[in-house]
């Protein structure tokens, strides 16, 4: 399956091929991104990393930053 990812705040868009039944975690690993500091959004709703993805999904990936 092919999914489109958009990494924020850079707005880098990339199409990647994943195996069927891949999860958001699989996608993050494929992109070499740390799942502990990333939020995956599909259809304007955050999804858990164990959520299965579907062909032609468009996923926004946001780096979670905290400070003090």
Language model regions located:
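Ubiquitin-like/PB1-type beta-grasp interaction modules and other compact soluble beta-rich domains
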Residues: 1-67
